[in-house]
């Protein structure tokens, strides 16, 4: 497994091979850090040993697990112009000891999920243990004039707040999307620390309809625990 250092943290890049979501072909060479310390994620069209073309995706995860706090991703790229089959995920995802797939997950995603038109982004919270609840996600439309955006997850024991803002910033100015999920049931909010992940992939493994490769740059990731710390549910 390939590892790299980005924004002061060690990240493991998913090993090359086939698997979900998708399924897709994952390529550990599709993540790199440039001299300015920015992370590059690529979706590439590759000719394999048999002479056939195939699409390669990328995913990476922090070696550390993070708890309640403020998660911020500063992105460079036209996330509003993705092909309908392209997905960018900025998210928290459980390790097997925390819970199975479909639990303990918080997502910011930019995708149309194969649709030619309609919303192109969503925020989602998967429960700790209960079945998914109505209102645990929201879709919205991103329309940019430039390529710089900031996206945040504010995770507390009783609620999750997500924000998206124009530009790279640490304040709340130029916010274009805000969502707060406070279900009133502790089972509907993740409670345990998990790694942070980012991935760039293809919905159902379907190649981009426009045939174009994609590169997204993450200029910075930051985490700040809440002060004072937010207590978990008993």
Go through the PLM ranges and name each one.
Residues 132-136, 170-180:
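Surface-exposed loop/edge segments in extracytoplasmic proteins
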Residues 1-88, 92-95, 104-114, 174-177, ...:
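Low-complexity, Ser/Thr/Pro/Gly-rich disordered linker/stalk regions
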Residues 144-168:
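Localized edge beta-strand/strand-to-loop motifs within extracellular or lumenal beta-rich domains
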Residues 36-38, 156-159, 193-194:
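Loop/turn elements at helix/coil->beta-strand transitions in domains of secreted/extracellular proteins
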Residues 97-147, 201-204:
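Glycine-aromatic-enriched beta-strand/loop faces of beta-sandwich-type recognition domains
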Residues 61-71, 139-147, 154, 189:
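Extracellular/lumenal carbohydrate-interaction signature centered on repeated Trp-anchored short motifs
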Residues 181-210:
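Flexible glycan-contacting loops in extracellular carbohydrate-active proteins
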Residues 114, 167-170:
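Short loop/turn segments immediately following beta-strands, especially the blade-tip
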């Amino acid at each position: 497994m390939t590892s790299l250092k980005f924004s002061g943290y060690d990240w493991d890049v998913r090993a090359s091979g086939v698997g979900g979501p998708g399924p897709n072909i994952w390529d550990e060479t599709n993540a790199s850090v440039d001299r300015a310390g920015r992370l590059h994620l690529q979706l590439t069209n590759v000719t394999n040993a048999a002479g056939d073309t195939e699409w390669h995706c990328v995913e990476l995860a922090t070696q550390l697990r993070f708890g309640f706090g403020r998660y911020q991703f500063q992105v460079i790229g036209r996330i509003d112009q993705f092909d309908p089959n392209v997905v960018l995920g900025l998210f928290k995802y459980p390790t097997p000891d925390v819970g199975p797939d479909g639990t303990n997950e918080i997502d910011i995603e930019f995708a149309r999920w194969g649709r030619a038109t309609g919303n192109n982004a969503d925020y989602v919270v998967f429960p700790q243990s209960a079945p998914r609840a109505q209102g645990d996600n929201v879709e919205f439309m991103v329309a940019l004039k430039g390529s710089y955006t900031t996206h945040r997850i504010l995770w507390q024991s009783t609620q999750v707040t997500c924000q998206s803002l124009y530009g790279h910033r640490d304040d709340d100015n130029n916010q274009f999307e805000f969502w707060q999920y406070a279900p009133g049931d502790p089972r509907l909010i993740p409670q345990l620390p998990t790694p942070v992940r980012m991935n760039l992939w293809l919905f159902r493994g379907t190649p981009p309809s426009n045939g174009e490769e994609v590169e997204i740059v993450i200029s910075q990731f930051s985490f700040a625990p809440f002060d004072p710390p937010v207590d978990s549910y008993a």
